[in-house]
């Protein structure tokens, strides 16, 4: 798989960009803050419908405009598809495949597969569980695009059920203070909570089963990737931690366990059981305490948790290993995702640079950003684009320029 053409309009600092790309290695070179990462961010958004840098779409739309556009022509096994995405301020985003509008933007998922490693990925090791859940869900959706709908349904039910818990909790607190019977809204919330329990368990079981299967498939690739980056270090491992607690047998979260056909039904049953156990606590606190939104991916070096105990170098290696493991997993599925490396070589020592360069040489297409050409290993033999931002009366605008060394010669 490779991106043959990329076009941007009013995306971040780019008012307009049209690039023709080719397989192999391409490097975007320029000072920090001049728009290099925005190019990779746009491709990442077309791949995952999310940014690795911000949680909302608003910062992606260039200041002073109400709409951003990103489009890419993707070649996969000889088949060419063009995906376009409009990001609209205050309105729903719109997507097209080969100029034909889609019903929902998520229908473009799976056309472009990317694996991006960026400095922000250190949060996979040192950050909150939400960073690791997002990593799992993006990789899961890349493998199985229909899981995006499962996650969307789960999030919708979660919001509704959380609102009911707040209403029910408030009603019961008023009763406990002697202010009479629960309000009509409170009584209605209590009555319908069981129905929403069923919806949450049904969607949550599908999402949980998908994540567990993913961790099972990912674990050996993670161990191998970390070993290649840090052969003298302790072995790296991962394990899923579920909020279902004692309702879920411990062996269910063992990465070595082979997923079975009946897992979803079993997980749904255990999900309902744990919701029943936690009902009073959830109503008291007004939040949903059970489900994939409360789970985590545990990272270990030997017997020690990586978070809080790994050195800076070990944390970098673990974060990079998670991305490389995802890349290897997608390739084992028969895909060859676009590998994107955002200003990472400068952060790595010589051994890790060599190990990463070896992976990059084997990929069909690699897109790299670097502040200076010397940050990129020579063996990658890359095509280079210079990137520069200029201040204008329309704000700061990025441009493709001649390579930095060519300009200095002139």
UniProtKB/Swiss-Prot annotation:
A single GO cellular-component term on record: cytoplasm
One GO term of the biological process aspect: DNA synthesis involved in DNA repair
Subcellular location per the Swiss-Prot or TrEMBL entry: Cytoplasm
Tagged with keyword DNA-binding: yes
Binding site for ATP: 30-37
Key words of the record: ATP-binding, Cytoplasm, DNA damage, DNA repair, DNA replication, DNA-binding, Nucleotide-binding, SOS response
Top-rank lineage group of the source organism: Bacteria
A GO molecular-function descriptor: ATP binding
Pfam family, one: SMC_N
Family from the record: Belongs to the RecF family.
Main function: The RecF protein is involved in DNA metabolism; it is required for DNA replication and normal SOS inducibility. RecF binds preferentially to single-stranded, linear DNA. It also seems to bind ATP.
UniProt-recorded name of the protein: DNA replication and repair protein RecF
Taxonomic lineage: Bacteria, Bacillati, Actinomycetota, Actinomycetes, Mycobacteriales
Name of the gene encoding the protein in the UniProt record: recF
